[in-house]
Amino acid sequence: MEAVGKHVKLFWNVYSDYAVLIAISLSYFVFDVLMLPFTRQFSLEDITISHPFALHEQVPTKYLGIICVFFPALVLYGFGKLRNNSLLFWKSLMGLLYSTMVCGLCVSLLKNAVGRPRPDFLARCQPFESTPKTGLVDVLSCSVPWSDKVLQDGFRSFPSGHTSFSFAGLGFLAIFLAGQLKMFRNKTSSWKVVVPLVPLSIASWIGLSRSQDYRHHKEDIAVGALFGFAIAYVVYRQLFPPLDHHNADILYVQAELDEGYTNVHSAGNSSATNAEQMV
């Protein structure tokens, strides 16, 4: 039994990160597809939800994974190859996936719980002509049936999923680049400051596009950006030292491995020296 316990512990130490990531990812996709939003009351006089419904979004959801996960993963792979360090790539990739999946799950739960109408909600709802123009009404005033996915999604405005996901993925990449390039070292080159701003600029553009498409209110976008970037930073700090650290580009686990190797190597040299002295 003791041997079995050791194997289970070893298995958990090695694969626990993968197991938790898979569980979070599955939960995210299940809740995102199956969970229904809270149907908040609204007013036909509310001009903030009276914008037209855009048939074509500037950044469709199907491209979000490519921009915010696949593209950053390629950059992480490039740094791993450049440094000849596969551990750097795999650990950073896990961080990227954790950042985006944790953010996606939390935002999905929050959006459905809050149930804030989108700026284009009335265009999705198409209220009956007999609906009172004053006062508050509910989803029963919509001529579009509740089973319609477009109407359901109209209650998922806060916070912005596109924006939070963008800053969770591209924000993680920006922090990673700042650390690898040691951006906060004294007398750093100006180009090292510009490079991390590129993914942040792309994430900001995605957030801005959600306002231009009338999918989100400005508060949804601002909170989504802060939330996504905060998760990215927290996840990053589980892997790397602070950005102003002299070894900001080295993984915690890498530093531990290198320190262990140094200690063993030093002990070996010390033993060899003692043996020579005895001879």
UniProtKB/Swiss-Prot annotation:
Gene Ontology biological process terms in this record: phospholipid dephosphorylation; phospholipid metabolic process
- Does the record's keyword annotation contain Transmembrane helix? yes
Span list, region Phosphatase sequence motif III: 209-220
Q: Which residues form a coiled coil?
A: none
For the protein in the UniProt heading, the enzyme class is: hydrolase
Gene Ontology CC annotation, any one: fungal-type vacuole membrane
Q: Which InterPro entries match?
A: P_Acid_Pase_2/haloperoxi_sf (IPR036938), P_Acid_Pase_2/haloperoxidase (IPR000326), PA_PP_rel (IPR043216)
Q: Which terms are listed as keywords in the entry? A: Endoplasmic reticulum, Hydrolase, Membrane, Transmembrane, Transmembrane helix, Vacuole
Q: Which reaction does it catalyse?
A: a 1,2-diacyl-sn-glycerol 3-diphosphate + H2O = a 1,2-diacyl-sn-glycero-3-phosphate + phosphate + H(+); a 1,2-diacyl-sn-glycero-3-phosphate + H2O = a 1,2-diacyl-sn-glycerol + phosphate
The compartments listed are: Vacuole membrane; Endoplasmic reticulum membrane
Topological domain, Cytoplasmic: which ranges? Answer: 39-58, 108-163, 209-220
Which residues point to the Lumenal side? 1-17, 80-86, 185-187, 242-279
- In this chain, the stretch annotated as Phosphatase sequence motif II covers 159-162
Described purpose of this protein according to its UniProt entry: Catalyzes the dephosphorylation of diacylglycerol phosphate (DGPP) to phosphatidate (PA) and the subsequent dephosphorylation of PA to diacylglycerol (DAG).
PANTHER family, sorted: LIPID PHOSPHATE PHOSPHATASE, RE23632P
Annotated protein name in UniProt = Probable diacylglycerol pyrophosphate phosphatase 1
